[in-house]
From Swiss-Prot:
Domain of life: Bacteria
Protein name as it appears in the record: Histidine--tRNA ligase
Subcellular location: Cytoplasm
Primary location group: cytoplasm
GO biological process: histidyl-tRNA aminoacylation
The organism of origin for this protein: Streptomyces griseus subsp. griseus (strain JCM 4626 / CBS 651.72 / NBRC 13350 / KCC S-0626 / ISP 5235)
The keyword Ligase is annotated on this UniProt entry: yes
Pfam families named among the record's database cross-references: HGTP_anticodon, tRNA-synt_His
This protein's UniProt keywords: Aminoacyl-tRNA synthetase, ATP-binding, Cytoplasm, Ligase, Nucleotide-binding, Protein biosynthesis
Molecular function terms from GO: ATP binding; histidine-tRNA ligase activity
Length: 420
């Protein structure tokens, strides 16, 4: 065992469990690629100010949870706590919004970092797949992204997730609601930190998970009663599009999410099998974020789905993904000459696109066959001096147990045919 361990609140992904994480990432990314979203990758760290402006200076993410560092040149950087601000920054820097048709549709995958209290389903290092549609204000786009996430979850076999939906209004109607909410909240019995939040961003108080606070919020003014006609019509169109597509959702008037940049449509994916940390993903519209970080007006919408949380949801439902074996053929040489010959065969198979592995280290037949079994290979190649003298190798079907000689010159063609 090493003297060192993974830092508190983080984890290592190792086989075989890592294969499930890769499969989840692929399942989420596949419908995005099929819908015109291009892949984007951003640095693991950014200027601190990007998140302070974009995510919100009063959010827990910025005030308590960011990992920050100072470079030798004095620059203040932060490990990325979320993906949207970085993706929008990169799109603006590359002038993608000027290069072609809008919206600019992007997807990404990576690790993110927040200094949180480690607990089941919540880590200081976590993996997400995200999607952003930049530069267009259209309820069809909001609905598209929600439907694609629903499609991804269902392709994995998940059934016990729910979609929560709300509208946060826009810069025209939200200030009126903000004032009404502040008036209501100031009369409640709240701690000093929460009272400071009332003055900076009162909507965040609605996201408070403490039971004593939630009890006091029962009679809070409803945002829906303050939405302007344009926001009401926009939200109803999103709801209608989801209903027409057969995607079930629940209206949640207190859903505000944890980031300050959201406007109008906001949504969250929750799974009832995950306890208190039930969110597996979420997102919404962020029409003003581009201007917050110094860009032009670019109404946009996006989401991020947690890979870690999705794997936990699969486990909660008892779902085991049908993962392909990483090895189709396993070669077992008996003797030095066989090692050279079979290694050449394995190399030829790999070049032909067959997943092949080799019994390294000169192990005996018994130990090598145990390794072949553990590899999950469908076929095993075995060769000794007598086989080589006859110009053959023994080909064993690991499922049926049948074994027979195959000419060395025909091994690659025979296996390619059998494996389809």
């Amino acid at each position: 065992m090493s003297t060192f361990q993974a830092p508190k609140g983080t984890y290592d992904l190792t086989p075989p469990r890592s294969a499930t994480f890769l499969a989840v990432r692929e399942a989420i990314a596949a419908p995005l690629r099929d819908s015109g979203y291009g892949y984007i990758e951003t640095p693991g760290f950014e200027n601190v100010e990007l998140f302070a402006r974009g995510v919100g200076e009063s959010t827990d993410i910025v005030t308590k949870e960011m990992y920050t560092l100072t470079t030798k040149g004095g620059s203040q950087l932060a490990l990325r706590p979320e993906g949207t601000a970085s993706v929008l920054r990169a799109a603006l820097e590359a002038n993608l919004h000027k290069a072609g048709n809008l919206p600019v549709k992007l997807w990404y995958s990576g690790s993110y970092y927040r200094y949180e209290r480690p607990q089941a389903g919540r880590y200081r290092h976590f993996s997400q797949v995200g999607a952003e549609a930049i530069g267009t204000e259209d309820p069809v786009l909001d609905a598209e992204l929600i439907i694609l996430a629903d499609q991804a979850y269902r392709s994995l076999g998940l059934r016990r997730f729910r979609i929560l939906l709300n509208s946060l209004g826009d810069k025209e109607c939200r200030p009126v609601y903000r004032e009404a909410l502040q008036t209501f909240l100031r009369d409640l019995d709240l701690d000093e930190e929460t009272r400071r939040r009332i003055e900076i961003n009162p909507l965040r108080v609605l996201d408070d998970k403490r039971a004593d606070v939630r009890k006091q919020l029962t009679d809070a003014p409803k945002l829906r009663d303050y939405l302007c006609d344009a926001c009401k019509a926009y939200h109803e169109e999103v709801r209608a599009l989801l209903t027409t597509a057969g995607v079930a959702f629940e209206d949640d008037e207190k859903l505000v999410r944890g980031l300050d940049y959201y406007t109008r449509t906001t949504f969250e994916f929750v799974h009832d099998g995950l306890g208190a940390q039930s969110a597996v993903g979420g997102g919404g519209r962020y029409d003003g974020l581009s201007e917050m970080i110094g860009g032009p007006e670019l109404p946009s919408v996006g989401w991020a789905l947690g890979v870690d949380r999705t794997v936990l949801a699969l486990e909660a439902e008892g779902i085991e993904l049908d993962l392909p074996s990483t090895t189709s053929v396993y070669a077992v040489p008996l003797g030095e000459e066989a090692r050279r010959v079979l290694f050449g065969v394995v190399t030829e198979l790999r070049r032909a696109g067959v997943a092949a592995d080799f019994a390294f280290g000169g192990r005996g037949l018994k130990g090598a066959m145990k390794s072949a079994n553990r590899s999950g290979a469908r076929y095993t190649l075995v060769a000794g001096e007598r086989d080589l003298a006859e110009g053959v190798v023994q080909l064993k079907d690991m499922e049926s147990g049948e074994q027979g000689p195959v000419a060395l010159a025909e091994v690659a063609a025979e296996l390619t045919k059998r494996l389809g």
